[in-house]
Amino acid sequence: MTDEPVQSSQPSQTLQISYSPCPNDTFVFDALAHGRVPGAPALDVTFADIDITNGMAERGESDVLKVSYAVLPYVLDAYALLPCGGALGRGCGPLVLTREAGADLTGRTVAVPSEKSTAYLLFRLWAADTIPGGVGEIVVMPFHEIMPAVRDGKVDAGLVIHEARFTYQNYGLHKLADMGEHWENTTGLPIPLGAIIAKRSLGTEALTLLADSIRTSVHAAWDEPEVSRPYVMAHAQEMDPAVADQHIGLYVNEFTAGLGEDGYAAVRGLLTRAAAEGLVPPLGPDALDFP
């Protein structure tokens, strides 16, 4: 599913960009995708869920992508982490849901949306700290199938993200643990969820312009949130507008405008801990530098 390329006021190559149809992404990119950021590069937008964009990044298939921070160790040779546009925050972490309150997950089956996701890394770090015997089988399934699978007893627990925070009780499920809460309590840092990356081959000038343009787009959305509403709701997959607003409020924040010292510390902290657990390759010392 693609949008037509938008012409910018400044001649430049059209950048292929892929991000999710989730409200936080469409809110952030609305002004930029619709040519309302003066001097910004033209974009050719493709919508894809983050598990798809993670794979696209590993194959080098797009100029700019919204990906999970968990995939960075695999792609930073070819892509640079942009200092804005992504999703970090507090109180917005993934949840582990069960049918019964207080269930013991030792040796139990857990459904996850992806094994290359920040949610999964946070889950494994939580499990390493809190389940000495370890969980059992990990089953990867599409995000929208996880809560029904837990409800129907097909799996013992499910790892969920995004708007499931607001809807899991509709399935009669219980929150066993909040991965973000565990992360924040043990590190004091925000939760790194989604990153914007762009090909290093675009060059310093283009990367800097892109980052500036994304930052401008974020501020435009904050200044006039009603302008982005049609774009957000057109791609929100029949989401209730109030849930879309909660989603935006949770995931679009100061770290979206700029990672800052805490944001970079959170990203490096997560990936360093994950590497120590053998979950991802180690990061080089300059891997997160921009541009």
Positions of the model-derived regions?
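A local structural motif
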Residues: R36-F47, A127-M141, V280-P285
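Pocket-lining segment of extracytoplasmic ligand-binding domains
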Residues: P142-M233
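Bilobed "Venus flytrap"/periplasmic-binding protein-like clamshell domains
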Residues: S12-H34, G93-A157, I161-E163, A265-R268
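Conserved C-terminal helix/tail region of periplasmic/extracytoplasmic solute-binding proteins
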Residues: R273-P291
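Hydrophobic residues within well-ordered alpha-helices
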Residues: M56-E58, V150-R151, L210, A274
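Secondary-structure end/capping motifs
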Residues: G203-R273
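Hydrophobic/proline-rich hinge and linker segments of small-molecule sensing/allosteric domains
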Residues: L81-G102, N185-S201
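Beta->alpha turn/N-cap motifs
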Residues: D49-D51, A57-P73, P142-F143, V160-R165
